[in-house]
């Protein structure tokens, strides 16, 4: 009997010891500076207030209609609160927009259409699942139509200046066909034949009255949302300084090449740059060599 009582006492002592240990641990945790706080977060999430008068490439956006207003509101919310992508786009604007603006002025394309490049590729040489490439997401057939060279060694869809010029010419052609820059943007996304077919079937000639695919239904609104944020980022909570923005890649000289380069690495080193620098400034060069046909001249950018 005494042994049983002794064992019971030992059990109670052990239980009390464990209980006190747990209580002590909890007390220490509550005092640690790493304890979770349930204080309100020091930020506020706001809805987006739409302006009463919004235009796209000089054409009115009928935000007085609830359907149009809500479609734009959706894209504004998505782009405003997609923080990392929006910040990267803001940083890249200073690098690429001046060149786009200059080429568009020369080709008579409204400046608002520069935001199409963000909607298409986020200002990068992207590759889509359908095979579209570059800043302007040209497919091979359209690229060739507007003078971009594509072969095993070269893809000028990745040539920023040339592809921007081609995009401007394509948009101008679409505007001539549809009589509207808004419809031109929609046609750029879904293709002119498909857009014309939808317009004929629905007997409508205004983008905002058309019922198109989900992607094209959202496309112009996405460009509009990007435009609103990019032109006044502080209104949407983005406060970037000049030092935050990426520098333009405009300090380079042009070297004309009229004969085959068996090694682009050797060519780079001969011009006192690295192979990587050569590729960064000339992403249209696909391989490590460049065959050049007689009479052909390629202009390669060499950073200073």
Regions found by a protein language model. Give the residues of each.
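An acidic, Gly/Ser/Thr/Pro-rich helix-cap/linker signature
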Residues: 2-108
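Solvent-exposed, acidic/flexible segments
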Residues: 86-97, 106-109, 128-136, 156-164, ...
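Short, functionally critical alpha-helical segments immediately adjacent to catalytic or ligand/cofactor-binding
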Residues: 109-124, 184-190, 278-281
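Extracellular LysM carbohydrate-binding repeats and other cell-envelope/extracellular binding modules
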Residues: 279-304
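Catalytic cores of secreted or luminal carbohydrate-active enzymes
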Residues: 214-237
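Substrate-binding/active-site groove segments that recognize
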Residues: 131-152, 164-167, 171, 195-198
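Catalytic and binding regions of secreted/periplasmic enzymes and modules that target cell-wall glycans
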Residues: 171-198
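Primarily a LysM-type cell-wall glycan-binding module
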Residues: 243-272
């Amino acid at each position: 009997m005494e042994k049983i009582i002794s064992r019971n006492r030992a059990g109670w002592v052990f239980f009390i010891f464990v209980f006190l240990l747990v209580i002590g641990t909890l007390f220490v945790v509550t005092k640690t500076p790493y304890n979770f706080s349930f204080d309100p977060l020091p930020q506020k999430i706001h809805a987006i207030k739409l302006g009463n008068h919004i235009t796209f490439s000089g054409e009115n956006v009928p935000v007085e209609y609830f359907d149009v207003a809500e479609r734009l509101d959706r894209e504004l919310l998505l782009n405003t609160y997609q923080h990392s992508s929006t910040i990267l786009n803001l940083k890249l604007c200073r690098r690429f927009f001046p060149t786009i603006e200059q080429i568009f002025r020369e080709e008579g394309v409204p400046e608002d259409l520069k935001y199409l490049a963000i909607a298409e590729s986020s200002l990068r040489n992207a590759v889509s699942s359908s095979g579209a490439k570059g800043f302007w997401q040209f497919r091979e057939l359209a690229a060739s139509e507007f003078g971009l060279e594509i072969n095993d060694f070269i893809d000028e869809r990745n040539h920023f200046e040339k592809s921007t010029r081609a995009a401007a010419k394509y948009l101008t052609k679409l505007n001539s066909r549809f009589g509207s820059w808004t419809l031109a943007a929609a046609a750029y996304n879904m293709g002119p034949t498909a857009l014309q077919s939808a317009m004929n079937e629905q007997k409508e000639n205004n983008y905002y009255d058309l019922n198109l695919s989900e992607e094209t239904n959202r496309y112009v609104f996405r460009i509009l949302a990007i435009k609103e944020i990019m032109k006044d980022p502080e209104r949407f909570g983005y406060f970037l300084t000049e030092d935050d923005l990426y520098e333009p890649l405009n300090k380079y000289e042009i070297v004309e090449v009229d004969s085959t380069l068996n090694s682009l690495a050797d060519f780079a080193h001969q011009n006192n740059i690295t192979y990587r620098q050569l590729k960064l400034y000339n992403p249209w060069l696909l391989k490590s060599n460049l065959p050049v046909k007689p009479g052909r001249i390629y202009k390669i950018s060499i950073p200073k």
